[in-house]
């Protein structure tokens, strides 16, 4: 990219400084500055000594120009734009499975009900060995490459060959539109506390969320723990709709303003169905954009307790500009502001992309005292609590990243993905039993009766890994929930089982369940 741009600059200098016999060109100095780039590219195309890939050069120039604006104004080539839009659309076109690659073979974790793969006969636990004529098992094929092989336009066909209990079975599958769910998990933690995990703000976020919340409310939920950790955002309108469910009429949600965009305010209409629900919002250093709009609105209105670590700090609004060749630009046109008036966009810097790593090195992820706030940007919530702008949402209740749970045995097992491989082996051995488990209590009972901890230690030993004397007693307290969660994912309960078993050692959830009188 920089080399291509350097070539452009070099050609410009040559045109200006040197005089070529019979080839000298001059341009009226009164032309619009924005035409300069077009003129340069035109001269390169018409006069450069060698053949030039004009598209690549144009892409590089546009990318470099946008890079001078802000970190979130970007140019997206056709493939990247399609992937970005698919991620947020709430559906994609493919065969309708979720799979994992614990060794070098893709194993089907779940088959989407009613989807093409279920109709064709694929089952949970099938090992995918070939897609059309391409072998993918044992080939060290990257997981994203496997995804691309199986995705494709609705109506097109693909042959997926699987290994099922030693038998190789080909399935002819007609691709179709597949829904992508953004609510990963929704369940009751106890008789009054519900938990919802949202991974993205897509086109279907509001409908998925409100459906889950209503079901939990019917089960007795009076306190919701809403998990926005690792949620990088998405559509702003979906964040507004979620905020509206919790706020009173006239409460401020967010406003946007830019040099060429007049101020636009979004307020709650008071028609929300969750205004009586106690709320805890979980955030971390990856929570960004729409996640921060929601967390900021709840914090500034003193509507919910924000628990976790300082959020990412993206306070910019992008507008899509798409081109006929399938590429597009996401151009920052405004900043968004929380109800108290703060913009939570963190400063642009040369180290912007490494900000989270820098937070870790200076101790912010492990100590509340190390949180970096801009004391020049002080704002106040409805009840008069002090909050800060200019660098993400600072939680009301800080929960440090847990770095103490890292025994040598645990680290070595993670390096070799032993837990993931063990879960796959357990599924192979107990497939019929796991397929008959209908509820979470039965799953827990099944795991206890099958002594998962002892089986895991034996499996790890076969991989050449054994805990030191006395090491397992402490390590098991945080390692076995991870192992059990991976095994539970192979049951009918899927992602719900995974999160319910993992949450046992989740200190942020534990903190959110405690009473916090802040306002």
Region spans (language model):
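Extended, small/polar residue-biased N-terminal targeting/export presequences
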Residues: 31, 46-109, 155-185, 501-513, ...
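Polar, glycine-rich mid-to-C-terminal structural blocks
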Residues: 290, 302, 309, 313-373, ...
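Generic structural signal for buried aliphatic residues
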Residues: 128-129, 158, 344, 387
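Cleft-lining beta-strand/loop regions that shape enzyme active-site pockets
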Residues: 21-33, 41, 45-49, 53-54, ...
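A sequence-level detector of short linear motifs
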Residues: 137, 170-172, 330, 345, ...
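Conserved functional hotspot residues or short segments at active or partner-binding sites
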Residues: 343-344, 348-519
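Hydrophobic membrane-insertion alpha-helices, especially the h-region
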Residues: 2-19
């Amino acid at each position: 990219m920089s080399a291509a741009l350097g070539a452009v600059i070099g050609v410009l200098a040559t045109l200006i400084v040197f005089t070529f016999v019979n080839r000298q060109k001059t341009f009226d100095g009164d032309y619009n500055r924005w035409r300069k780039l077009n003129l340069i590219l035109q001269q390169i195309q018409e006069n450069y000594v060698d053949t030039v890939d004009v598209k690549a050069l144009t892409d590089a120039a546009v990318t470099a120009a946008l890079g001078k604006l802000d970190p979130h104004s970007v140019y997206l080539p056709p493939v990247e734009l399609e992937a970005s839009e698919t991620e947020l659309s709430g559906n994609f076109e493919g065969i309708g499975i979720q799979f994992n690659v614990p060794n070098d073979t893709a194993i089907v974790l779940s088959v989407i009900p009613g989807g093409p793969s279920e109709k064709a006969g694929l089952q949970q636990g099938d090992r995918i060995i070939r897609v059309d004529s391409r072998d993918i098992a044992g080939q060290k094929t990257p997981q994203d490459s496997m995804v691309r092989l199986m995705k494709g336009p609705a109506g097109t066909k693909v042959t997926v060959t699987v290994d099922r209990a030693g038998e190789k079975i080909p399935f002819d599958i007609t691709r179709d539109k597949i829904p992508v769910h953004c609510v990963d998990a929704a369940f009751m933690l106890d008789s009054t506390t519900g938990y919802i995990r949202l991974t993205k703000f897509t086109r279907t976020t509001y409908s998925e969320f409100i459906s889950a919340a209503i079901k939990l409310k019917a089960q007795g939920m009076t306190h919701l723990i809403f998990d926005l950790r690792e949620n990088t955002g998405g559509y702003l309108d979906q964040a507004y709709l979620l905020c509206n469910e919790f706020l009173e009429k006239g409460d401020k949600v967010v406003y946007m303003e830019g040099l060429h965009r007049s101020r636009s305010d979004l307020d709650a209409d008071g028609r929300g169905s969750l205004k009586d629900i106690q709320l805890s919002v979980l955030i971390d250093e990856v929570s960004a954009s729409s996640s921060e709009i929601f967390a900021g609105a709840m914090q500034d209105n003193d509507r919910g307790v924000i628990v976790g670590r300082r959020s990412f700090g993206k306070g910019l609004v992008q507008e899509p500009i798409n081109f006929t060749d399938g590429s597009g630009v996401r151009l920052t046109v405004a900043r968004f502001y929380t109800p108290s008036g703060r913009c939570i966009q963190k400063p642009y810097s040369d180290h912007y992309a490494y900000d989270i790593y820098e937070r870790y090195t200076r101790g912010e992820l492990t100590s509340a005292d190390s949180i970096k706030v801009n004391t020049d940007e002080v704002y106040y919530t409805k009840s008069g609590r002090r909050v800060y702008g200019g660098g993400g949402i600072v939680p009301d209740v800080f929960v440090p990243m847990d770095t103490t749970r890292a025994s040598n045995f645990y680290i070595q097992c993670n390096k070799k993905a032993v837990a993931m491989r063990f879960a796959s082996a357990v599924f192979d051995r107990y497939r019929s039993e796991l397929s008959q488990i209908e509820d979470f209590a039965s799953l827990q009972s099944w795991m206890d009766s099958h002594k998962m901890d002892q089986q895991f230690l034996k499996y790890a030993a076969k991989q050449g890994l054994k805990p030191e004397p006395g090491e397992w007693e402490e390590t098991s307290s945080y390692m076995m929930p991870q192992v059990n969660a991976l095994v539970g994912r192979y049951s009918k309960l899927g992602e719900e089982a995974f999160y319910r078993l993992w949450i046992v050692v989740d200190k942020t959830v534990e903190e959110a369940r405690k009473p916090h009188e802040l306002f």
